[in-house]
């Protein structure tokens, strides 16, 4: 391997000038469990055999034994990690999704996708869309996964993600409207963006902090063929047309000590004046940093994030 390092993110990974990546820490795979954790069970399902891609489904234990026709909201979640790190099966995501399902009484699907730089942008968006389409094969109750057939309420579908996963969730909500998923006039009930990874040249110049330059470099690694850099519509969503956002409600979570918070606020401002028909709200945790609720899930502020998340899912959609 070429020893010239282009980007050093020790102790997680190093990127070399020849395009190679060295992942320095073995990634931990948390297995699914049919033994309930916090009253939640989980299992994995393959959504793309040709790409060897799977996802994890979380279900409240009491729903397993439900004999009636009760359906519960469906949450589709995209993990973060700068498009490069973490997986749907990482400890922090298994812990968070288990807690989220316990708090909201929903069925959740956590999507695994191929990551950069081995698979540059836009591969992960296409993988995520494949997962959405696979999930929606269950809307007729004849899909390959019994839990989704029996328990998912497709009139109450939510998209969510943190950091890079929040970016993915946004693009999936745009594509849902553009591709016109069945049934006719279908809309996502709501979208929750935890500390979204949105950039633009203006934001970077305005902040003038090294941490923001780090996120810019990370994007260039994930999307090396982008001629527009951080003006690329994949990452500069604020500079794109938001009127086609295919959901009725949006909750944006921002953290006061997170340099990406400015992008979250800009997204909210643009959404409000875009002509999009929907409602957007913001929850700010002033004294915390990026994805603190994943790193310290037992803190009071993390619990407050989870409560707000649960309340948003339980609100009636207008």
From Swiss-Prot:
It catalyses: a carboxylic ester + H2O = an alcohol + a carboxylate + H(+). GO terms for molecular function: carboxylesterase activity. InterPro entries: AB_hydrolase_3, AB_hydrolase_fold, Carboxylest/Gibb_receptor, Lipase_GDXG_put_SER_AS. The keyword Secreted does not apply. Expressed in roots, stems, flowers and siliques. Pfam families: Abhydrolase_3 (PF07859). It comes from the Eukaryota. One of its GO terms (cellular component) is plasma membrane. Keywords: Acetylation, Hydrolase, Serine esterase. Its EC number is 3.1.1.1. A motif (Involved in the stabilization of the negatively charged intermediate by the formation of the oxyanion hole) lies at residues 79-81. The modification N-acetylmethionine is found at residue 1. The keyword Cytoplasm does not apply. The active site is at residues 163, 258, 290. Carboxylesterase acting on esters with varying acyl chain length. Belongs to the 'GDXG' lipolytic enzyme family. This is Probable carboxylesterase 1. It comes from Arabidopsis thaliana. The gene is CXE1.
